Swiss-Prot record:
Residue stretches of biased makeup (Acidic residues): 148-160
UniProt-annotated stretches for the region Disordered: 30-101, 128-163
GO biological process, one term: symbiont-mediated suppression of host JAK-STAT cascade via inhibition of STAT1 activity
Keyword tags: Host-virus interaction, Inhibition of host innate immune response by virus, Inhibition of host interferon signaling pathway by virus, Inhibition of host MDA5 by virus, Inhibition of host RLR pathway by virus, Inhibition of host STAT1 by virus, Inhibition of host STAT2 by virus, Interferon antiviral system evasion, Metal-binding, Viral immunoevasion, Zinc
Physiological role: Blocks host interferon signaling.
Annotated positions binding Zn(2+) 2: 255, 267, 269, 272
List of residues binding Zn(2+) 1: 232, 251, 276, 279
Name this protein carries in UniProt: Non-structural protein V
Gene name for this UniProt entry: P/V
Basic and acidic residues composition bias: residue spans: 79-99
InterPro entries: Paramyx_V_Zn-bd, Paramyxo_P/V_N
The keyword Zinc belongs to this UniProt entry's keyword annotation: yes
Organism: Phocine distemper virus
């Protein structure tokens, strides 16, 4: 390939050099283009071979021998026609590949061709394997054609009803051949995991069942016999192993002692008193040493 490319490059440079030394006029360019179009159309209709096309181009060259620039243009025409002949080989190789890949609806075949369009023998890679279009099985595929029917029959027996392998979850010993098989197995595994989580409603860890907690509004509505005291807020802890912990807390009033750097909790219910019952009548509450100003703490 490198020698052929170097040959074409050298020829192209020679043609460019010749055209720079003796540039053709518009009449000669138009005449040569008309002759090329006529020869191409006639060869396409009559099906002439490459040898006849070369004879036609030689006749054109002989008719334009008086000038050196005409020879350079004829060289360009010859290289163009050779390029057309060289381009036919990849097209034929592509047609052969398409014919080989359409052998059956359930089998995909891949072959390797060289630049001449001939099949290369002795190359065995992942693309040369026969891959069925059905679901993955527990057995790896082989490159032999006779093993395809056996693998299909064995897979139908393995995935029969009542067998543990019929579950599409992850099983040890599974040997997928391609990345597509691995992604399919991962999707099936995730689907099975999500299905079991929704059906069971809970998961067991170390012998204990994790229950998802209900919404606090619904839980409080069910506890109608225990109303919330005024000035309190109610919190519910995480439900673990059917044990529920209800916590009653005061919203921090301004008379509660806090340490420096502690952020006072804000009242979210709007009903908590600003001070406790013990301090509401204390005239010295404003002089507590752990506050700078009570108004600043309530912001």
């Amino acid at each position: 390939m490198a020698e052929e490319q170097a040959y074409h490059v050298s020829k192209g440079l020679e043609c460019i050099k010749a055209l720079r030394e003796n540039p053709p006029n518009m009449e000669e360019i138009q005449e040569v283009s008309n002759i090329r179009d006529q020869t191409y159309k006639s060869s396409k209709e009559s099906g002439t071979t490459g040898v006849q096309e070369e004879e036609i181009t030689q006749n054109i060259d002989e008719s334009h021998t008086p000038t050196k620039r005409s020879n350079s243009v004829s060289d360009v025409l010859q290289e163009d026609q050779r390029g057309r002949e060289d381009n036919t080989a990849p097209v034929e190789a592509k047609d052969r590949i398409e014919e080989d890949t359409q052998t059956g609806p359930a089998v995909r075949r891949y072959y390797v061709y060289d630049h001449c369009g001939e099949k290369v023998k002795g190359i065995e890679d992942a693309d040369s394997l026969m891959v069925p279009a059905g679901p993955p099985s527990n057995r790896g595929f082989e490159g032999r054609e006779g093993s395809l029917d056996d693998s299909i029959e064995d897979s139908s027996e393995d995935y029969s009803e009542g067998n543990a392998s019929s579950n599409w979850g992850y099983t040890f010993g599974l040997n997928p051949d391609r990345a597509a098989d691995v992604s399919m197995l991962m999707e099936e595994e995730l689907t099975a995991l999500l299905g079991t989580g929704h059906n069971a409603g809970g998961q067991k860890r170390d012998g204990r069942t994790l229950q998802f907690p209900n919404s606090p509004e619904g839980s409080i509505g069910n506890q109608a016999c225990e109303p919330i005291k005024k000035g309190h807020r109610r919190e519910v802890s995480l439900t673990w192993n059917d044990d529920r912990c209800w916590i009653d807390k005061w919203c921090n009033p301004i008379c509660t002692q806090v340490n420096w750097g502690v952020i006072r909790a804000k009242c979210i219910c709007g009903e908590c008193p600003p001070v406790c019952d013990d301090c509401k009548d204390d005239p010295e509450m404003q002089n507590r040493i752990w506050y700078e100003t009570p108004t600043r703490e309530t912001k």
